[in-house]
């Protein structure tokens, strides 16, 4: 049998030209460079945990890792106890009642949720309202999926809340989705 040594260049999808490098990816590189130069940097970047979990949490994780029933896929909607716990937390902290069976979907992260919501509700060419400043993923995923991003400003003097009067005066006829963060972003 003859061995073939051939390399194929696989070009990225054209849609990637519509986005730039993730904002926090660039910032983390800048922070790493500054640290390498011996500068004392206080990172105000992504909310990556900087403290280990409690001993009780680590012990519980270790104990559960030994459970032979704990290694399979979980239900797509998450386990009921988790969804109920989320609903109780929202009620306690925000006074918001959520139905754990129909209004809560555990995810592996916000990017997964933003992707799924955009795929489910927005067609290419439709518009999406994105807060400025806001989470960069709203813009990057919207662009990758072929939607038109319309920014709306969040201002400190307005408590970082949307100016609904300004929004009402805009042509929103093609807007399919409005991204918001609550309590708010930036936090």
Each language-model region and where it sits:
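A short helix-loop-beta submotif of the ANL/AMP-binding
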Residues: 144-149
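Short glycine-rich anion-binding loops that position phosphate/pyrophosphate groups of nucleotides
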Residues: 49, 111, 182-185
């Amino acid at each position: 049998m003859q061995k073939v040594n051939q390399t194929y260049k696989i070009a990225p999808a054209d849609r990637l030209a519509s986005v730039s490098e993730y904002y926090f990816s660039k910032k983390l590189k800048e922070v790493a460079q500054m640290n390498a130069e011996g500068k004392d940097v206080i990172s105000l970047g992504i909310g990556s945990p900087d403290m280990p979990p409690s001993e009780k949490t680590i012990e519980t994780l270790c104990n559960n890792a030994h459970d032979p029933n704990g290694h399979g896929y979980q239900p797509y909607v998450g386990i009921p106890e988790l969804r109920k716990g989320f609903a109780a937390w929202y009620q306690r902290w925000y006074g918001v009642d959520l139905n754990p069976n129909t209004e809560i979907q555990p995810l592996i992260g916000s990017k997964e949720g933003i992707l799924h919501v955009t795929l489910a509700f927005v067609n290419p060419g439709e518009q999406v309202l994105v807060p400025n400043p806001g989470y960069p993923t709203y813009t990057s995923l919207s662009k990758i999926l072929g939607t038109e991003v319309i920014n709306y400003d969040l201002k400190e003097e307005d408590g970082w809340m949307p100016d609904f009067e300004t929004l009402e005066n805009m042509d929103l006829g093609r807007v399919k989705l409005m991204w918001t963060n609550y309590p708010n972003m930036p936090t």
